[in-house]
């Protein structure tokens, strides 16, 4: 493939592109309305808003409607925020009434400004953004209802969230466990617990979770620049995530749970030891004795197959971990890298385990129809042939054209912009590679000529 004539320089937007040596000029005045292109042998490159619609409507595959899912994904509710204004008391009664009227009118105006949708006229479609519950004060069970209305969203929030929402959920989890009637867990006893201070910049992971036989366990505290440090205690494994959503669920006692687990472990160990003793006795009775030529007896010892015991800390998530992760899933299914690191250090898990748990939950919800992944330009059910044809004539889009393509493909503005950016990067790479090949060929030819002259 010959790339000699494909030398594109996309840093400068005034490119010369044509079919066979033609050129298309782009001026700043025609950037918003029309494009004018002139070429000796190239086709006409004038494209307006009407021509874009003709290109889109020309392809039958492009007009095919996207397949609707069985059940649409749940979206977050619109949380209305209201502002309150304080008024100062005056001596006369008339002035106080005026101040009250002014304050009420100001509060109405402020609330109307906050609640008015579509404030930004440039954005045509509103996206579901994961709202962090850091603004709420958790003081009673009624406040927990504000967290139960969160649904699953397919949008990755670009906003920088405060990691304090992780501690809010775990504190709510611990408080509900301490308020449950069937509970013998004392969250205030931290005598036998190790509380580790974790910074967001540290890479050390800890595993504070103890064995099931212990009555208490700890969850480490966070000291980050954006959140205040708070010591957190892990609840008992009898607590269920259903208590967070205010459903009555009967829970078992932690002491009974530990006693049952200890009895089961003791019974299993006794059976295992008895089986080993019986096997050893049988093997000793069935020892084979062989005699050598000298008359010496050689005892052939049997090989005893003993199961290897598990060593190290358990990598499986405990019941507390699953319940806390279930509460974190309700807030966001796309945690940032900083949030994933904090969660892994709090729960004593690795970074990859937390990341894979969120990925598996997204896959599970998508199979059940409760969650749908964000649409990509390549798999949105519409072909990209009109975009490719438009890219051959013009490598850059105006804001108006980008919005029209985004509305036609039902994708975001940034996806169309990134699509053209990626196409330009590919052409840049091909042109640079072609130039490098040409330089290598020229160097080889010069070397051959020099060798022939010397010969």
From Swiss-Prot:
Primary localisation category: nucleus
Region called Disordered, residue ranges: 1-53, 67-121, 178-239, 258-296, 431-455
Known DNA-binding region: 310-369, 372-431
Ranges of biased composition (kind: Acidic residues): 446-455
Sample GO molecular function, one term: DNA binding
Keywords of this entry: Coiled coil, Developmental protein, DNA-binding, Homeobox, Nucleus, Repeat, Transcription, Transcription regulation
Pfam family of the protein (one): Homeodomain
Skewed-composition ranges (Low complexity): 1-16, 24-39, 81-118, 179-239, 263-294, 435-445
SUPFAM superfamilies: Homeodomain-like
Cellular-component GO terms for this entry: nucleus
CDD domains listed in its UniProt record: homeodomain (cd00086)
Localization terms from the record: Nucleus
PANTHER family (alphabetical): BRAIN-SPECIFIC HOMEOBOX PROTEIN (PTHR24327:SF41), HOMEOBOX PROTEIN (PTHR24327)
Function of the protein: Putative transcription factor.
Protein name: Homeobox protein 14
Species: Dictyostelium discoideum (Social amoeba)
């Amino acid at each position: 493939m010959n790339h000699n004539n494909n030398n594109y320089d996309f840093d400068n937007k005034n490119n010369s592109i044509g079919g066979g040596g033609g050129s298309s000029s782009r001026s700043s005045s025609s950037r918003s309305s029309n494009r004018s292109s002139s070429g000796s042998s190239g086709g006409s490159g004038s494209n307006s808003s009407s021509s874009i619609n003709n290109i889109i409507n020309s392809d039958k595959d492009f007009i095919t409607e996207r397949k609707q899912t069985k059940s649409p994904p749940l979206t977050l509710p619109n949380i209305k925020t209201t502002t309150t204004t304080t008024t100062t008391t005056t001596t006369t009664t008339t002035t106080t009434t005026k101040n009250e009227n002014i304050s009420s009118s100001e509060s109405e105006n402020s609330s109307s400004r906050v609640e008015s949708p579509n404030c930004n006229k440039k954005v045509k479609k509103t996206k579901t953004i994961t709202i962090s519950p850091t603004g709420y004060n958790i003081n009673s069970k009624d406040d927990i209802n504000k967290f139960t209305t969160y649904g699953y969203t397919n949008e990755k929030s670009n906003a920088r969230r405060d990691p304090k929402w992780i501690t809010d959920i775990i504190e709510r989890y611990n408080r509900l466990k301490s308020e449950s009637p069937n509970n013998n867990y004392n969250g205030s006893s931290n005598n036998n617990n190790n509380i580790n201070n974790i910074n967001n910049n540290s890479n050390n992971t800890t595993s504070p979770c103890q064995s099931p036989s212990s009555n208490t366990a700890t969850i480490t505290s966070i000291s980050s620049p954006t959140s205040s440090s708070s010591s957190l205690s892990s609840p008992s494994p009898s607590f269920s995530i259903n208590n967070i959503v205010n459903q009555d669920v009967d829970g078992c006692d932690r002491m009974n749970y530990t006693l049952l687990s200890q009895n089961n472990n003791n019974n299993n160990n006794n059976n295992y030891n008895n089986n080993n003793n019986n096997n050893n006795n049988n093997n000793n009775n069935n020892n084979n004795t062989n005699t050598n030529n000298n008359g010496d007896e050689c005892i052939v010892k049997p090989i005893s197959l003993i199961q290897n015991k598990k060593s190290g800390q358990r990598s499986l998530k405990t019941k507390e971990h699953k319940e806390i992760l279930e509460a974190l899933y309700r807030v966001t299914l796309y945690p940032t890298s900083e949030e994933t690191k904090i969660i892994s250090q709090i729960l004593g898990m690795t970074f990859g385990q937390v990341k894979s748990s969120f990925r598996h939950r997204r896959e599970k919800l998508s199979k059940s129809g409760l969650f749908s992944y964000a649409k990509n330009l390549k798999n949105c059910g519409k072909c990209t042939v009109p975009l490719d044809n438009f890219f051959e004539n013009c490598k850059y889009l105006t804001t108006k054209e980008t919005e029209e393509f985004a509305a036609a493909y039902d994708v975001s503005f940034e996806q169309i912009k990134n699509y053209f950016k990626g196409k330009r990067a590919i052409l840049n790479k091909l042109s640079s590679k072609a130039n490098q090949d040409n330089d290598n060929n020229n160097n080889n030819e010069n070397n051959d000529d020099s060798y022939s002259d010397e010969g």
